[in-house]
Amino acid sequence: MSSDAKQQETNFAINFLMGGVSAAIAKTAASPIERVKILIQNQDEMIKQGTLDKKYSGIVDCFKRTAKQEGLISFWRGNTANVIRYFPTQALNFAFKDKIKLMFGFKKEEGYGKWFAGNLASGGAAGALSLLFVYSLDFARTRLAADAKSSKKGGARQFNGLTDVYKKTLKSDGIAGLYRGFMPSVVGIVVYRGLYFGMFDSLKPLVLTGSLDGSFLASFLLGWVVTTGASTCSYPLDTVRRRMMMTSGQAVKYNGAIDCLKKIVASEGVGSLFKGCGANILRSVAGAGVISMYDQLQMILFGKKFK
């Protein structure tokens, strides 16, 4: 094996490890706000199913009611599935991103537009590829996070844990139930990851220069701006996919992503597609932390700098 091939394998392993570790730490820290986001986002579906007594008036109301009814530890409900899911997801995203970017072979000297498009394509392809491996865990995390205690059902939960989600879903809907909402997820992940990686890689050499070069704070803020923009653009797709996830095990289901989108807009209004978006913007701080921690950890531990 040539020295270049060995170096590529080493870089791949570094990308896999650093991306996964950074993601696991960041997602655990952001678990409370992420659960609030999922509860607010799916509250209309939860009310239909009788698992929520009344709508949340906002982020603060959701925090207060959840803490009072379920306890503080409940904010980490579904976090185990999220960490299990997020570790390989982010690790594969970061690892495949650089691999796929090499396949495009575009250099900045060949033209900024082509180079920027290559970054978008590599980031999007990496995200979509990773999704194939971990979608069922994303489904389970959503069902656990949206499984609130309801007085209408005597305070009982629908699921007792990660394994229970799999058992009940497979029993009622089969393997297809674990992949409900997959197609809008693929579209959403391409949009989100494409912007997430592509814009960061493209804007970093333009913004993080001079005194800002190597600055963790500057890298973090740039990452936050990028993740906020990317997540807001793709948020309606995220709402559609999660609402489709919520129908597994239910008698009434949507006939695809378009049908789901139409029914949400018709019965709840366009604004419903963005419910929980405010909490999602706060949650994106974790995403910014991941991408900046990824850079910093590689520079500290391995002396690797991106160009």
From Swiss-Prot:
It is found in: Mitochondrion inner membrane. ADP:ATP antiporter that mediates import of ADP into the mitochondrial matrix for ATP synthesis, and export of ATP out to fuel the cell. Cycles between the cytoplasmic-open state (c-state) and the matrix-open state (m-state): operates by the alternating access mechanism with a single substrate-binding site intermittently exposed to either the cytosolic (c-state) or matrix (m-state) side of the inner mitochondrial membrane. Monomer. The matrix-open state (m-state) is inhibited by the membrane-permeable bongkrekic acid (BKA). The cytoplasmic-open state (c-state) is inhibited by the membrane-impermeable toxic inhibitor carboxyatractyloside (CATR). The chain crosses the membrane at residues 12-39, 80-104, 112-132, 182-203, 217-237, 277-297. Its main location: mitochondrion. It is a multi-pass membrane protein. It comes from the Eukaryota. It holds the Pfam family Mito_carr. GO terms for cellular component: mitochondrial inner membrane; mitochondrion. Solcar repeats lie at residues 10-103, 114-206, 214-300. Keywords: Antiport, Membrane, Mitochondrion, Mitochondrion inner membrane, Repeat, Transmembrane, Transmembrane helix, Transport. The keyword Mitochondrion applies. ADP binds at residues 85, 97, 241. SUPFAM superfamilies: Mitochondrial carrier (SSF103506). The transmembrane helices are not perpendicular to the plane of the membrane, but cross the membrane at an angle. Odd-numbered transmembrane helices exhibit a sharp kink, due to the presence of a conserved proline residue. This is ADP,ATP carrier protein 3. InterPro entries: ADT_euk_type, Mit_carrier, Mitochondrial_sb/sol_carrier, Mt_carrier_dom_sf. Coiled coil: none annotated. It catalyses: ADP(in) + ATP(out) = ADP(out) + ATP(in). Present with 1080 molecules/cell in log phase SD medium. GO terms for molecular function: ATP:ADP antiporter activity; identical protein binding. GO terms for biological process: anaerobic respiration; heme transport; mitochondrial ADP transmembrane transport; mitochondrial ATP transmembrane transport; transmembrane transport.
